[in-house]
């Protein structure tokens, strides 16, 4: 068996693995990555972030066509099958894989396609798909194997009418009705997508409200627009069992209700991909969700083994995962840029989309911070009136005495882009983080960015 020597070996080529590998390679280290799939990119590129967002964009264009009065004058509404809409996502995946493969080649990072397993803390055996088993010895190892959907044992996921968030992208038809169990980020995003395709959707939420980590006003807006689009939301509901037939599924609820639909999408939680890694051989333990614990340098209990991305749990965002991997690589060799990633913007790609950074009103109230609120409704901005994307708002939370920005919350078209302006000002040191930036800055007109000036004026007028 061939043994190859590296400074760093990274398990996984998703955002966290890519961030760690690229950072280590640019620091002059010899790096290898191990990918369990046949292509680089991880679940983010093939099963999660990229295909679902490409799918969402296609559905959003269909909705725009079917609701724009100008198009209604020249033809009837058009509806597309789920597989046809999915073709667009597949084209994006191919481009992403090609680009990322080039990045690894350009940085002279060796790629091993196969499954890696620890022999000891410095040795990993890779059962490659082409050349058979090989041994990789490394001074440092990064576990960035990501996560997978949680699949309870009492649901038959092999049934053709039952899907998880990984398998839903293989759906070969457009169901007339769909039960989505789990109203987290993934559940809400897919509820928007299928609702936009004309599917009758029931969204089952085991909690008492949607996305409770968001600001209450944003959550209320999301709930309203999902219902306005035809989604039936059921809060505080859990299931007892799922009955399957050739024509659909029946979900028996703990409350006694019975729900019937053509298909079921179960997306209630995720588990870390840590099984079959041989972690027992290095005495590395995982929690009940298969996730690894790390310190503020992304180091695990084993000195030379680090972890990043979904496999360590919160915040389970592709954007944060890349930075976590980069920080882990920096910490390995004492390089700058190894700060623990804590303040990250949240992007939720419902229709309309949501993004936020910083504190919510509930958090500031609990902390007894004297804050004030500034709002700008998109319907009052010229750009939104021009584009027809008038649904939504920008909300700024700031300290009423120092005018320091404390939170930015956005709901509506381009929310995940708009939030970064506020994030940039919030990251400024000292008195440079101030609401006055928006009051004194000239914004292009007409733009969505000018909502910051409108919201700042709205909030500043409340200060006395």
From Swiss-Prot:
A Pfam family the protein falls into: Pyr_redox_2
Catalytic reaction equation(s): NAD(+) + NADPH = NADH + NADP(+)
InterPro entries: Class-I_Pyr_Nuc-Dis_Oxidored, FAD/NAD-bd_sf, FAD/NAD-binding_dom, FAD/NAD-linked_Rdtase_dimer_sf, Pyr_nuc-diS_OxRdtase, Pyr_nucl-diS_OxRdtase_dimer, STH_gammaproteobact
Cofactor(s) recorded in Swiss-Prot or TrEMBL: FAD
Cofactor note: Binds 1 FAD per subunit.
Entries under SUPFAM superfamilies matching the protein: FAD/NAD(P)-binding domain, FAD/NAD-linked reductases, dimerisation (C-terminal) domain
Gene3D superfamilies named among the record's database cross-references: 3.30.390.30, FAD/NAD(P)-binding domain
Keywords assigned: Cytoplasm, FAD, Flavoprotein, NAD, NADP, Oxidoreductase
Superkingdom of source: Bacteria
Residues that span the membrane, as ranges: none
Enzyme Commission no: 1.6.1.1
Single GO MF annotation: dihydrolipoyl dehydrogenase (NADH) activity
GO cellular component terms, semicolon-separated: cytosol
Residues that bind FAD: 35-44
Classification via HAMAP family: SthA (MF_00247)
Protein name as annotated: Soluble pyridine nucleotide transhydrogenase
